[in-house]
């Protein structure tokens, strides 16, 4: 007696084996994960303290020498010692036009909308455009106090911008020239392996296998199984014709 009425046992066993193989393949793919790389050890920034024994050895060697003798070690240390600054000279203050904090800029557009940008004084006009408008820096014009900032190599520190200053921004919407059409023989093909394109060949291969089993083992295929196989063949033929027709 057949396991499923109207379907032969060979067909049932074949579909069961295919289902088991599919489940095993999905389980293997889901568990196939790459191990993460181990983090690199961070170098220790703690300096090694100086051993006190070295200082004691230097002191003992100095005491053992004669008072009038001059050792090479003392001469070397005397030459390497930096000169002490005189009392009358004051330290040079840092220049007032080199702030350490970033500049806060307000980019104002034609529709009165604003955008806050942060930049450093050593940044250039071109780097500011690339940071705030990636891919559109060629269509952006910055205006400060009625002057067009057209030199992209000019630094922000040279402009002496005050905090929270307003830079008027004009973004051009002009579209570039259209690209020439590609020749018929150089059309880019699909990249990568498409799973959908493999479904129809697999179904055709399975259909051929079923028809081979139906011919070789005709007693195991009743009339209902043969009619179902013929209907499936007709449906798959229409699908293949619809997909591959010019």
From Swiss-Prot:
Residues covered by region (Required to release iHOPS from membranes):
2-30
Lyase found in the keyword field: no
Q: Locations of Pro residues compositional bias?
A: 40-50
Xref: InterPro entries: TMUB1/2, Ubiquitin-like_dom, Ubiquitin-like_domsf
Positions carrying Phosphothreonine are 71, 92
Q: Where is this region: Disordered?
A: 35-102
Phosphoserine sites (modified residues):
98, 127
Looking at the record, the residues that make up the Ubiquitin-like domain are: 103-176
The membrane-topology field of this record reads: Multi-pass membrane protein
Query: Which segments of the protein form a coiled coil according to its record?
Result: none
One BP annotation, GO = ERAD pathway
- Alphabetically list the UniProt keywords: Cell membrane, Cytoplasm, Cytoskeleton, Endosome, Membrane, Nucleus, Phosphoprotein, Postsynaptic cell membrane, Synapse, Transmembrane, Transmembrane helix
Is the keyword Nucleotide-binding assigned to this protein?
no
Question: What's a GO cellular component annotated to this UniProt protein?
Answer: recycling endosome
Q: Which domain of life is it from?
A: Eukaryota
Q: Show the stretches that span the lipid bilayer.
A: 11-31, 195-215, 221-241
PROSITE patterns, per the entry: UBIQUITIN_2 (PS50053)
Q: Where in the cell is it found?
A: Membrane; Postsynaptic cell membrane; Recycling endosome; Cytoplasm
Instruction: Report any Pfam family annotated for this entry.
Output: ubiquitin
Q: How does it assemble?
A: Interacts with EEF1A1, GRIA2, GRIP1, CAMLG, TUBG1. Interacts with NPM1 and CDKN2A; TMUB1 can enhance interaction between NPM1 and CDKN2A and is proposed to bridge the proteins; proposed to be mediated by iHOPS. Interacts with ERLIN2 and AMFR; TMUB1 promotes the interaction of ERLIN2 with AMFR.
The protein's job, in short, is: Involved in sterol-regulated ubiquitination and degradation of HMG-CoA reductase HMGCR. Involved in positive regulation of AMPA-selective glutamate receptor GRIA2 recycling to the cell surface. Acts as negative regulator of hepatocyte growth during regeneration.
Q: Which PANTHER family match?
A: PROTEIN C7ORF21 (PTHR14557), TRANSMEMBRANE AND UBIQUITIN-LIKE DOMAIN-CONTAINING PROTEIN 1 (PTHR14557:SF3)
Q: What is this protein called?
A: Transmembrane and ubiquitin-like domain-containing protein 1
Q: Which organism is it from?
A: Bos taurus (Bovine)
Lineage of producing organism: Eukaryota, Metazoa, Chordata, Craniata, Vertebrata
């Amino acid at each position: 007696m057949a396991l499923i009425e109207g379907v032969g046992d060979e067909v049932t066993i074949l579909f069961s084996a295919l289902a088991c193989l599919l489940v095993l393949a999905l389980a293997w793919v889901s568990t196939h994960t790459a191990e993460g790389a181990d983090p690199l050890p961070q170098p220790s920034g703690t300096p090694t303290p100086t051993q006190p024994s070295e200082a004691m050895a230097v002191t003992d060697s100095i005491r053992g020498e004669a008072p009038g003798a001059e050792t090479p070690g003392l001469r070397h240390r005397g030459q390497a010692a930096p000169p002490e600054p005189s009392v009358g000279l004051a330290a040079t203050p840092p220049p007032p036009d080199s702030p350490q904090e970033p500049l806060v800029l307000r980019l104002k557009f034609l529709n009165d909308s604003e955008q806050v940008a942060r930049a450093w004084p050593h940044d250039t006009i071109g780097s500011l455009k690339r940071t705030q408008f990636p891919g559109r820096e060629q269509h952006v014009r910055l205006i400060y106090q009625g002057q067009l900032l057209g030199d992209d190599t000019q630094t922000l520190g040279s402009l002496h911008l005050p905090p929270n200053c307003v830079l008027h921004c004009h973004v051009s919407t002009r579209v570039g020239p259209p690209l020439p059409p590609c020749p018929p023989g150089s059309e880019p093909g699909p990249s990568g392996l498409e799973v959908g394109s493999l479904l129809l060949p697999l179904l055709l291969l399975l259909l051929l296998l079923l028809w081979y089993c139906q011919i070789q083992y005709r007693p195991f295929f009743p009339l209902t199984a043969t009619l179902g196989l013929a209907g499936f063949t007709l449906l798959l033929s229409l699908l293949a014709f619809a997909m591959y027709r010019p």
